[in-house]
A protein has these predicted regions:
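N-terminal extension/subdomain marker
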Residues: 30-85
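Gly/Ala-rich beta-loop-alpha elbow adjacent to hydrolase catalytic centers
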Residues: 155-159, 163
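C-terminal motif of bacterial Sec signal peptides marking the signal peptidase cleavage site
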Residues: 23-26
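N-terminal secretory signal peptides that target proteins for export/translocation
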Residues: 1-8
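Sec-dependent N-terminal signal peptides
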Residues: 9-19
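Loop/turn elements at helix/coil->beta-strand transitions in domains of secreted/extracellular proteins
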Residues: 54-56, 99-103, 147-150, 177-181
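Surface cap/lid and interfacial helix-loop subdomains adjacent to catalytic sites
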Residues: 133-147, 169-242
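Active-site catalytic motif of lipid deacylating hydrolases and related acyltransferases
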Residues: 61-149
Length: 242
C-alpha cells in the first residue's frame, strides 16, 4: 500500500504546478433532504465515480467560482450557469489526478467572492454552510463508495480552505487517516498554529511521504501580504518539484 501511495504522489507532483498557475488568475438555498438522500443523487455531484480501474479515489473540492453578483453569499444549487463555471474550474484541476484516481467532486453551496471581504465573525455562517455541504458529501462518499480504497484529497483556494477543515474534523480517526495517500491543499495558508492545535496533521517533507498535506502558494514579487498570507503570517509549504 505504501509503495502504491508513493507512486500516486509522484505522478501528480509536476502537473500541479502548471495547473496552479492557471487557476491563480444574501440568499441561501437550503438542502431539505437528509445527506444520504441528497448526495445519493448523481445530479448533486459535478463528478461521481469518474474513471475506472484506477489505483485510488480522489475527493476534489472546487475553488471559488461564484462572484456573488446577485447579492448572494452562498452559491445556489439551482444556479445552472454558475454550476457550468463550477465544472469548468474542476476541469482545470482534474488532469493532475485523473490518470491515478477515480474522481468524486460534489456540488456545494460555496461562499461567494464578496464573503472574503468580511470579518471572520461575519464570514462564519456562510463558511459553515459551505463546509457542512462538503462534509456531508464526504461522509456519503466514504460510507458508500470508498470500499477501502486509497484516497487522495485535493482542493484549491476555497476548496483547500474547506479541505483543511475536513482534515481537522475527520482525519484524527484511523478509519479515515489510514486510507489517505495525501491531501493537496493548494492555494491556502496552513500555519504552525494549525499543526499545533491539530497534531494529527502532518506536512509533507519529501516525495515518498504518505498520509500528509502538500501545500504551497505563489505571490508576485514585491507582494507583502494577501488574503491567503496576511501580513506577519508564516505558512507551511513544500516545493512540489523536490
Amino acid at each position: 500500500m505504501i509503495n502504491s501511495k508513493s507512486r500516486v504522489i509522484r505522478i501528480v507532483a509536476l502537473a500541479i504546478v502548471s495547473v496552479f498557475i492557471l487557476l491563480c488568475c444574501a440568499c441561501v438555498q437550503e438542502k431539505d433532504e437528509p445527506i444520504v438522500e441528497y448526495y445519493s443523487k448523481i445530479e448533486n455531484w459535478a463528478y461521481y465515480a469518474e474513471g475506472e480501474d484506477k489505483a485510488a479515489d480522489l475527493f476534489l473540492i472546487c475553488p471559488t467560482v461564484d462572484m456573488g453578483k446577485g447579492g448572494n453569499y452562498n452559491m445556489s444549487m439551482d444556479d445552472t450557469k454558475t454550476k457550468e463555471s463550477f465544472v469548468g474550474a474542476l476541469n482545470m484541476e482534474r488532469g493532475i489526478y485523473e490518470d491515478s484516481a477515480i474522481m468524486y467532486a460534489p456540488y456545494y453551496r460555496q461562499m461567494t467572492f464578496p464573503v472574503y471581504n468580511m470579518t471572520a465573525d461575519e464570514m462564519q455562517p456562510y463558511l459553515e454552510i459551505a463546509y457542512r455541504d462538503v462534509a456531508d458529501a464526504f461522509e456519503y462518499y466514504f460510507e458508500n463508495c470508498n470500499n477501502g480504497r486509497p484516497l487522495i484529497l485535493a482542493g484549491f483556494s476555497q476548496g483547500s480552505q474547506l479541505l483543511l477543515m475536513l482534515l481537522k474534523e475527520y482525519f484524527d480517526d484511523p478509519k479515515y487517516s489510514e486510507k489517505l495517500v495525501a491531501a493537496y491543499c493548494i492555494g491556502w495558508g496552513i500555519t504552525e498554529d494549525d499543526i499545533a492545535q491539530f497534531p494529527h496533521l502532518k506536512m509533507a517533507q519529501g516525495e515518498d511521504d504518505t498520509g500528509v498535506i502538500i501545500s504551497f502558494n505563489t505571490e508576485a514579487e514585491g507582494i507583502e501580504e494577501s488574503l491567503i498570507v496576511p501580513a506577519g503570517t508564516k505558512t507551511l509549504a513544500i516545493n512540489p518539484l523536490n
